[in-house]
Amino acid sequence: MTVKLTIDCMGGDHGPSVTVPAAVNFVRSHPDAELLLVGIESAIRAQLKKLKAQDLPALTVVPASEIVAMDDPVEVALRKKKDSSMRVALNRVKEGEAQACVSAGNTGALMAVSRYVLKTLSGIERPAIASALPNPNGYTMMLDLGANVDCEPQHLLQFAEMGHALVSALEGKDRPTIGLLNIGEEVIKGNDTIKRAGELLRASTLNFHGNVEGNDIFKGTVDVIVCDGFVGNVALKTSEGLAQMLSNIIKEEFGRSWLTKVMAVLALPVLMRFKKRVDHRQYNGAALLGLRGLVIKSHGSADAYGFEWAIKRGYDAVKNGVLERLARAMEENAGSLEQAARDASGAGQASPIAGQPAEPYAAQSSKA
């Protein structure tokens, strides 16, 4: 099976200087992958020439005349830049010419344009950003990580359904455990939204573990952790900052004297394994779930190594049939999700119209 992905080469802080080398490295190690490199043709070809990769048959350059800048408002990306590398890459997925799109572009713009071009799956009101965070036994899937700052209880239930389908597809688990991120394990804790979401999850057919706390994220307590995008994005950035700080402290301490430098040489194998386990670049690439196409969001600041991992996330998602499994799961649970929405509306909680852009998109950090 050939996996064909589109790469938004102009997205992110570094553009083609990062995205093109990552794409070249990826196809050289994955012979069953084909990548469509979308963006300013001259800039892409200059990088390919630099890498001596002009003739790689697995790479195809797709011209696009505009770039969505990292600080562009959503409205500009959506209404004015219709020939942007982001828009063209997503259109190729919509038209069936590729199976997934990978972009390091402006988060708010990517979510809004993806939603406009690809539309949402039946039963999904708001797509969510999901990514894997390391734990001692592998990883914990967490969502939402920044797409929806404010959520209603039924949205958190939808996120749980999508997280369940994603982990089932990637890990082969029939009933992955679901946790709801809260300030305590007790059902009486949390705000009204969290309490109501907990009730919906307990009444669902999901394997709901219950409330989990921030320290459970890296323990591997559950397979999937659900939260709103504000909390999720803060947790993600905090973990990345902590990992970087620990690496810097260790490097500084081992460089203090000749004795510590000798100790560093002796401990090098252990240090290298530690660095690899906490290197957030290996976890780069978050899936935009709930759309009628696969979209992978890379960090805007990612280097070539990190962006290559984002490409791998898209590749793995296609190979494991994530989109098909997600669509099937949403269809099977459509009744319970609709009932949850009606219950929430009956309790006086506003529910946005399905298919309409959610307000939080415009407020997203461009590098989330």
From Swiss-Prot:
Record keywords: Cytoplasm, Lipid biosynthesis, Lipid metabolism, Phospholipid biosynthesis, Phospholipid metabolism, Transferase
GO molecular function, one term: phosphate:acyl-[acyl carrier protein] acyltransferase activity
Catalytically driven reaction(s): a fatty acyl-[ACP] + phosphate = an acyl phosphate + holo-[ACP]
Segments for region (Disordered): 337-368
Entry EC no(s): 2.3.1.274
Chief localisation class: cytoplasm
Any one annotated GO CC term: cytoplasm
Assembly notes: Homodimer. Probably interacts with PlsY.
Role, per record: Catalyzes the reversible formation of acyl-phosphate (acyl-PO(4)) from acyl-[acyl-carrier-protein] (acyl-ACP). This enzyme utilizes acyl-ACP as fatty acyl donor, but not acyl-CoA.
Name of the protein in its database record: Phosphate acyltransferase
Organism: Paraburkholderia phytofirmans (strain DSM 17436 / LMG 22146 / PsJN) (Burkholderia phytofirmans)
Gene: plsX
